[in-house]
């Protein structure tokens, strides 16, 4: 089985300089949805590109065969541009880059039906308002497809529509393509004409209108996003996740969340994030591509491409940037930013700190206002803080630097050299007290 994805259109009605198939749906480009599904049912996948072909090509896996349709002259013309992809002894599944939610199950049903001896198998659906769609007309055991623009008045009441998804026998398709003409209202080469040439046609019906919805406008894309969002929320609710306000909760379809986790309002969980069991997330929190363990609490914070182990507390108003690893039972408090750093088990950074390019051990206390000065103007340098160290408030650790196990850094210090284990590090000016100075100064004035 081969799958050919037609994705050459510009998408004029999207009013965008970005190719239509690259517009994201629930966090990933529409074409990525289709290619992933195609790869589950077909041994080889090809894609026909057109507008901004090189830009789209960069998003595709290396195992996808790419063909280019220089001029968009219809669906059959797009398939002709990939003629070398079609093998006489193999079947070909036709998909579309702007119809992202076609399901693996439906495609498998089509393939199974097709293998009963068909030249072509069509996916159809019944719509209350079929206007704009080609109709599937049955005449005994024969089927033909008439495009909406070419439909005679007496057939406009037919509600069975052609979704555009087909499985073709490779032998039949190679014979049919040269016979297709552009003698129609739009002057294009329709793949539906190949169906009309077929002697052995089989039909599979879908009742899920989401999976056959094509995206031609931003309005449709937003509608599809909302339908997919609510479908995901319903799935999570059925599997033991509490979502306090579905209307203000945005969770990408690829996200996984464990049972007994509570999601508060205004929470965004995106990408390939995985959240464990018995967590509390939000309110007003954004999580992107994170691995989160069990019993984790994240409040009013942003976490991006980070790993958070069990029993960790984050926030409020913390920011975890890419490469952050929070070990078990660590605590990150308000207005703390962490980047490319590992925070050890039981370590606390509760207030107003920046930790970048650092390796922090177990049970370390990071005092309020601690800064790792990692950038020297040319490169980022590492800071090492070993187990049990205590960093006093308002300290600056000028990297590269190492704070030894159990060492103590006095509040207000600027540390530029390594501090040995169990040592006191001080780096501040000596305090001067002048008794009565204020009164004396006032008399002079």
From Swiss-Prot:
Gene3D superfamilies: Hexapeptide repeat proteins, Spore Coat Polysaccharide Biosynthesis Protein SpsA, Chain A
Active-site residue numbers: 351 (proton acceptor)
Record CDD domains: GT2_GlmU_N_bac, LbH_GlmU_C
Cofactor(s) named in the record: Mg(2+)
Molecular-function annotations in GO: glucosamine-1-phosphate N-acetyltransferase activity; magnesium ion binding; UDP-N-acetylglucosamine diphosphorylase activity
Chief subcellular location: cytoplasm
Subunit structure, as described in the record: Homotrimer.
Protein name from the UniProt record: Bifunctional protein GlmU
Function comment: Catalyzes the last two sequential reactions in the de novo biosynthetic pathway for UDP-N-acetylglucosamine (UDP-GlcNAc). The C-terminal domain catalyzes the transfer of acetyl group from acetyl coenzyme A to glucosamine-1-phosphate (GlcN-1-P) to produce N-acetylglucosamine-1-phosphate (GlcNAc-1-P), which is converted into UDP-GlcNAc by the transfer of uridine 5-monophosphate (from uridine 5-triphosphate), a reaction catalyzed by the N-terminal domain.
Organism the protein comes from: Thermotoga sp. (strain RQ2)
Annotated spans, N-acetyltransferase: 240-445
Chain positions recorded as UDP-N-acetyl-alpha-D-glucosamine binding sites: 6-9, 20, 69, 74-75, 96-98, 134, 147, 162, 216, 321, 339, 354, 365
Lineage summary: Bacteria, Thermotogati, Thermotogota, Thermotogae, Thermotogales
Keywords: Acyltransferase, Cell shape, Cell wall biogenesis/degradation, Cytoplasm, Magnesium, Metal-binding, Multifunctional enzyme, Nucleotidyltransferase, Peptidoglycan synthesis, Repeat, Transferase
Binding positions for acetyl-CoA per the UniProt entry: 368, 374-375, 393, 411, 428
Known EC number: 2.7.7.23, 2.3.1.157
Protein encoded by which gene: glmU
Region (Pyrophosphorylase) residue spans: 1-218
This protein's GO CC annotations: cytoplasm; membrane
PANTHER family linked to this entry: BIFUNCTIONAL PROTEIN GLMU, NUCLEOTIDYL TRANSFERASE
Region entry Linker, spans: 219-239
